[in-house]
A protein has these predicted regions:
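Conserved acetyl-CoA-binding loop-helix of GNAT-fold acetyltransferases
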Residues: 122-135, 158-162
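Active-site rim helix/loop that mediates acceptor-substrate recognition in acyltransferases
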Residues: 43, 54-82
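Conserved beta-strand-loop-alpha-helix junction that forms the acyl-donor binding cleft
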Residues: 147-156, 173-174
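A short, internal acetyl-CoA/4′-phosphopantetheine-binding micro-motif in the GNAT/acyltransferase core
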Residues: 111-121, 149-150
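Conserved GNAT acetyl-CoA-binding A-motif
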Residues: 137-148
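Conserved acyl-donor/pantetheine-binding loop and adjacent beta-alpha core of acyl/acetyltransferases
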Residues: 81, 87-113
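A short beta-loop-alpha structural element at the N-terminal edge
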Residues: 26-41
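Conserved acetyl-CoA-binding loop of GNAT-fold acetyltransferases
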Residues: 161-170
Length: 174
């Protein structure tokens, strides 16, 4: 489990429309209710470490309720587009002491859920999404953000440490 209390201004591509971009541009679009199906796909990718054929964990259905069913667009999120192709996304989950995900630290600090499509890994999309989500959380009054990453996900660990996250605890497998 990681927490980030540095709120940084997003310095990557501004939020705009995928319709106004070329195929090489990275565009972040505010996630809406109509993106729920794509967020569900991204949630699957977080559970299987991006393995399209991977088996979901035993807790997948229970976790889906918190991470997807309870998410509403007013909680915040972004979809990354590379041209006209969705490349990943991030969404904020504002847990309570009673209902929360693996990365919950405390009420008022949103937990991020993030995934990038395999074909776009290593292109800075995860960084752009994290910066956008961090800025959004700051604008929404959060003193920090948190996330959870599986112990075996070394690539994600490197990214989060590089961006200033600190490990603040461990839960089984995370």
């Amino acid at each position: 489990m990681y927490v980030h209390d540095k709120m940084v201004r997003m310095n990557s591509t501004p939020v705009s429309s995928p319709d106004s971009s070329s195929e090489d541009d990275l565009v972040l679009v505010v996630a809406t209710e109509s993106d729920r199906t794509y967020l569900s796909r991204l949630n699957f990718l977080t559970d299987t470490f991006g393995d399209e054929f991977g088996e979901v964990t035993a807790d997948f259905d229970r976790d889906w309720i918190y991470y997807l069913q309870n998410w509403t667009e007013d909680k915040g999120g972004f979809i990354a587009w590379r041209g006209h192709i969705p490349a990943g996304g991030v969404w904020l989950n504002w847990g309570t002491d009673e209902l929360h995900g693996f990365g919950h630290v405390e009420e008022g600090i949103p937990e991020l859920a993030l995934a990038v499509e395999n074909r776009y890994k290593g292109e800075g999309i995860g960084t752009a999404l994290l910066e956008a989500a961090t800025e959004l959380a700051r604008q929404m009054g959060a003193p920090g953000i948190s996330l959870s990453v599986a112990a075996a996900n070394e690539r994600a660990h490197r990214l989060y440490f590089h961006l200033g996250f600190e490990q603040v605890g461990e839960r089984e497998g995370h």
